[in-house]
Amino acid sequence: MGSWYYVGVDVGSASVRAALVSPDGQLRRTAEEPIAVHEPCVDHYEQSSTEIWSKCCQTVKRVTEGVDAACVRGIGFDGTCSLVVLDQQFRPLAVNLAGVCDRNVVMWMDHRAAAQASRITACRHTLLQRVGGVMSPEIQPPKLLWLKENLPDSCWTRAAHFFDLPDFLSWKATGSLSRSLCTLVCKWTYSASEGWDDTFWSAIGLEDLIEDSYARIGSQVCCPGAAVGRGLTAAAAADLGLNEGTAVGASLIDAHAGGIGVLGADVSGLHLPCEHQPLTARMALICGTSSCHMAVSREPLLVPGVWGPYLSAMLPGLWLNEGGQSATGKLLDHVVKGHAAFRQLEEQAEHSGRHIYTQLNLHLQQMSTDATHLEQLTTHLHIWPDFHGNRSPLADQTARGTVVGLSLSQTLDDLALLYLATLQALALGSRHIIAAMTEAGHDITTLFLCGGLSKNTLFVQTHANTTGLPVVLPAEREAVLLGAAVIGACASSDCTSIPEAMRKMSRVGRVVRPNPELQSFYRRKYSVFLRLYQHQKECVSLMED
């Protein structure tokens, strides 16, 4: 293989992936390795940073096998916004009551700190405006407070380094303790213009983090894509099979890498409403285990229940608002795999050689007369999808799932309908988030989807039909990996900025447009959707009186 390349590494919830990417954005090779998720009790999710780094090394070696290491110009890392804890000697510290040191990562979806998050919200600090007014248990301050209160001796007093997972990867690669502006601004309450706020950390009981200029959580900050340290250390280069000094870009949260991987695509001639419009008309929707809804603006926009605005957290000079759903792919798996007919579905999928969701989509086609009729099969079946709480736009971690319209049926038809209703509920949740952002001043006209669920044709079409917006799918479906490679390209100085690299490396694959015949159906479905939450809160209130 000739020419030169960049490597993108993406650490997701359940796997590590790497890609070898050409300067024009083509993914020449990809590799994937699973990583374990430990669930010692309800709402606790833990991982091992040692295993994660090992899988990073394995995947990078696989995609660069046979490639002259001198041809790899830069590498970029992204990861989930999980919390990594190390001691003074950079050894893993247990984040669990069992004292298992190898499990030193509190995952992003861990909700153990729900009570701490509620107490932080009750402080009413002005800084909470940056997180939609409500502190989420999915970002770092509540998790840190939980560790201090529940593991004071075994973890808190021994911990010297708290990293967001993307920053841990940068440190392993370069030895630099600098943090990415992306992670600190979005998950740690850092301000791009004002830095850390001492009054916030003191108010929530974490004043000890202020010591030594916040050395335990980050005293040096660099912009996404900036070259970190002196590139790969000798040890990291040996681990990864690359050359010492290879440029390493300041890391990104995985959703932000997805946004960078899709938003810059040229839409000329596609007759989309965002054509000839700035990037502020586009929303990136990164759909995997969870979903993130990323929109940028030229001026800061405060959206109740939506994280941000964050200056330059994803794109330089633009303010980012980040909505999201805590469980999307995970919810679909929960609904489908827990059904009595799942084994029958699994057997059919194995026999046909199809993925289970492709098989379900086909089954729904067989149950309907046409595409319009298919989505109306759930006229009397409705779901509120917040089985793991509502991240946006309600910011209600106490919200739970609701299903209206169940029967005694345990057939494959029943499973298919529940699956369809779940897809629609997730899409209606996206509509809810977009509505909140629009009310606050965003003007979103086109969706750009990526992530694992973007490969599900019915998920994509349902989003177009529910929101009434066209959906753009990237030519390279692994857009998160592409986004990671973009920051590697920026670090190498082959591209002078992230926007330049986005234009060079992102391309449109396919456009999915809404079906106007379903507009009335989804208007009514959305009205029911909103009432499900209202009724849930009424029921809770009645029982608590």
UniProtKB/Swiss-Prot annotation:
One Pfam family named in its UniProt record: FGGY_N
The organism's place on the tree of life at top rank: Eukaryota
Enzyme class, UniProt record, top EC level: transferase
EC number: 2.7.1.-
Gene Ontology BP term (one): pentose metabolic process
GO cellular component annotations of the record: cytoplasm
InterPro entries: ATPase_NBD, Carb_kinase_FGGY, FGGY_C, FGGY_N, FGGY_RbtK-like
Keywords, in A-Z order: Kinase, Transferase
Gene Ontology MF terms: D-ribulokinase activity
Record family assignment: Belongs to the FGGY kinase family.
Protein name (record): FGGY carbohydrate kinase domain-containing protein
Gene: fggy
